[in-house]
C-alpha cells in the first residue's frame, strides 16, 4: 500500500509547525570519537533541508549504538550534531535527553527553520519496548511526524511506530520514500528479467530472503560461504569450507523449489581456495567437484564470474545482497569486485541495480562504484525483511497516500 510522503505536504502545512523527524544517524566512530563515515547523515539532508526551507521547526530523533536503556557517555549524539551542523551550514542544538525539561525548553525556543537533535532515544529502555507513555512524551514535542529512518523501519519502537498514534499527519521522508519505491518496486512490479544475487557466509541468515526471491525472480545467483552448504547437500567434498550441517536438507529443498518453478538457480562452478583463513594465505583455484582436503573456499572463481556475468547480461532489474567471498582480504575480493563492476556496467545500459544493504554496500563503496548503482539501500535488516515480503512496522504505521 502506498504511503503518504513529505512531498504531499506544502509550505502552508509545515510553516511554523514542530516536526518530529526520525532519522538513522547510527554512524561509525573511531577510537577518538570521530565519525568515520557520514553517509547516513548526508542521506537525511534532503528531508531536513526541505522542512527547514518550508519554515518548519525540525526536531530530529535518532538512536546510536546499543546503550541498553541507560545513559552511556560514549553513545551521546554530540559528534553527530557537530557534523550535521557543518553539512547544513547552520547551528544544530542538541538536547541532554530526548524527553524532559531540557528537550521541552530547547524546542520551545526554536524559531521557524531551526534544527534540534534530541539525545539518543535508546538511553531509555521504553524506546525498544515501544512503551506508550514514553512515545506520548516524545510525540508531545511535535505536531507532525516524518519517518526517514528506513534502517530502523523493521523495528516497532516508540520513535518509529509508537509516536504515530499521537501525531497526524505521519508521513515518509524522502529517503524512506526512495527506499520503498526501489525495494518494494523490485519485489512487486519489476522490469524483467529480474535477478537476485545473494551472498554472505550463512544460509541460515538468508533463508527467508532466498525463499521469497525464488518465488519472485527469474534468476537467483548464489555466492559467498553459503555455497558450500549447497555443495555438501549435493554430495560434494568441500574440504575445510564453512558448512551448516543442519541446513543441508533446506539447501536441497531450495534447489528443488527453484527447479519446480522454472527459476534459474546458479551456483559457482569454481572457487578460490585458501589453506587458512588469512589475508596472506596460500591460494589456488579449483572446480567445485575437486576441492582438496584441508583447503577452504574464500571466493568464487574466474569461470564462475564469467557464468554469472553471462546470466546477468539480459537482466532489467538486479538485486544484490551479500558479497561473493571474503572481500575484506584483497586476495579473495575478485569475485565481489567483478559483480560490482558488472552491475555498474548494467546500470549504464538502463538496468535497475539495487544494492540491498549490509556488506554489499561496503563492497560497492570499496570498489568506488557506489555512484553508478541505481539505488543503494541504507537498511540492512530492513532491506532483507522488505525483500522477504514482510510488513515493516515503521512503514505500516504511516498514513496511507490519498
UniProtKB/Swiss-Prot annotation:
Listed pathway(s): Carbohydrate degradation; glycolysis; pyruvate from D-glyceraldehyde 3-phosphate: step 2/5
Any one GO MF annotation of this record: phosphoglycerate kinase activity
Keyword entries, A-Z: ATP-binding, Cytoplasm, Glycolysis, Kinase, Nucleotide-binding, Transferase
Catalysed reactions listed for this entry: (2R)-3-phosphoglycerate + ATP = (2R)-3-phospho-glyceroyl phosphate + ADP
The keyword Nucleotide-binding is annotated on this UniProt entry: yes
InterPro entries referenced in this protein's UniProt entry, alphabetically: Phosphoglycerate_kinase, Phosphoglycerate_kinase_CS, Phosphoglycerate_kinase_N, Phosphoglycerate_kinase_sf
Membrane-spanning segments: none
CDD domains: Phosphoglycerate_kinase
Cell compartment(s), UniProt: Cytoplasm
UniProt-annotated binding residues for substrate: 24-26, 40, 63-66, 122, 155
One cellular component term from this protein's GO annotations in UniProt: cytosol
SUPFAM superfamilies: Phosphoglycerate kinase (SSF53748)
Binding positions (ATP): 206, 297, 328, 357-360
Top EC category: transferase
Family: Belongs to the phosphoglycerate kinase family.
The protein, known as: Phosphoglycerate kinase
Organism: Synechococcus sp. (strain RCC307)
Name of the gene encoding the protein in the UniProt record: pgk
Amino acid at each position: 500500500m502506498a504511503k503518504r510522503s513529505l512531498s504531499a505536504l506544502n509550505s502552508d502545512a509545515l510553516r511554523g509547525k514542530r516536526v518530529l523527524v526520525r532519522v538513522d544517524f547510527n554512524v561509525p566512530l573511531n577510537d577518538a570519537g570521530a565519525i568515520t563515515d557520514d553517509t547516513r547523515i548526508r542521506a537525511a539532508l534532503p528531508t531536513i533541508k526541505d522542512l527547514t526551507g518550508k519554515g518548519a521547526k525540525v526536531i530530529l530523533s535518532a538512536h546510536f549504538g546499543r546503550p541498553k536503556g541507560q545513559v552511556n557517555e560514549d553513545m551521546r549524539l554530540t559528534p553527530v550534531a557537530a557534523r550535521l551542523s557543518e553539512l547544513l551550514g547552520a547551528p544544530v542544538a542538541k538536547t541532554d535527553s530526548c524527553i524532559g525539561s531540557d528537550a521541552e525548553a530547547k524546542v520551545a525556543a526554536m524559531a521557524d527553520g531551526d534544527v534540534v537533535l534530541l539525545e539518543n532515544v535508546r538511553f531509555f529502555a521504553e524506546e525498544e519496548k515501544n512503551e506508550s507513555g514514553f512515545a506520548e512524551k516524545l510525540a508531545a514535542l511535535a505536531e507532525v511526524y516524518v519517518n526517514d529512518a528506513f534502517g530502523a523501519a523493521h523495528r516497532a519502537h516508540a520513535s518509529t511506530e509508537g509516536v504515530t498514534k499521537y501525531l497526524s499527519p505521519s508521513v515518509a521522508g524522502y529517503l524512506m520514500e526512495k527506499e520503498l519505491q526501489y525495494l518494494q518496486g523490485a519485489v512487486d512490479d519489476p522490469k524483467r528479467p529480474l535477478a537476485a544475487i545473494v551472498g554472505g557466509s550463512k544460509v541460515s541468515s538468508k533463508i527467508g530472503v532466498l525463499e521469497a526471491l525464488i518465488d519472485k525472480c527469474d534468476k537467483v545467483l548464489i555466492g559467498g560461504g553459503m555455497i558450500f552448504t549447497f555443495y555438501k547437500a549435493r554430495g560434494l567434498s568441500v574440504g575445510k569450507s564453512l558448512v551448516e550441517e543442519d541446513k543441508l536438507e533446506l539447501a536441497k529443498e531450495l534447489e528443488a523449489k527453484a527447479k519446480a518453478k522454472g527459476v534459474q538457480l546458479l551456483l559457482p562452478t569454481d572457487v578460490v581456495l585458501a589453506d587458512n583463513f588469512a589475508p596472506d594465505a596460500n591460494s589456488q583455484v579449483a572446480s567445485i567437484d575437486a576441492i582438496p582436503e584441508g583447503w577452504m573456499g574464500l571466493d568464487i572463481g574466474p569461470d564462475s564470474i564469467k557464468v554469472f556475468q553471462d546470466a546477468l547480461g539480459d537482466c532489467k532489474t538486479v538485486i544484490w545482497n551479500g558479497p561473493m567471498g571474503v572481500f575484506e582480504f584483497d586476495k579473495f575480493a575478485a569475485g565481489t569486485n567483478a559483480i560490482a563492476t558488472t552491475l555498474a556496467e548494467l546500470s549504464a545500459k538502463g538496468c535497475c541495480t539495487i544494492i540491498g544493504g549490509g556488506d554489499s554496500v561496503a563492497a560497492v563503496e570499496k570498489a568506488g562504484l557506489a555512484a553508478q548503482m541505481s539505488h543503494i539501500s541504507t537498511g540492512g535488516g530492513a532491506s532483507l525483511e522488505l525483500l522477504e515480503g514482510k510488513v515493516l512496522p515503521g512503514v505500516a504505521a504511516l498514513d496511507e497516500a490519498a
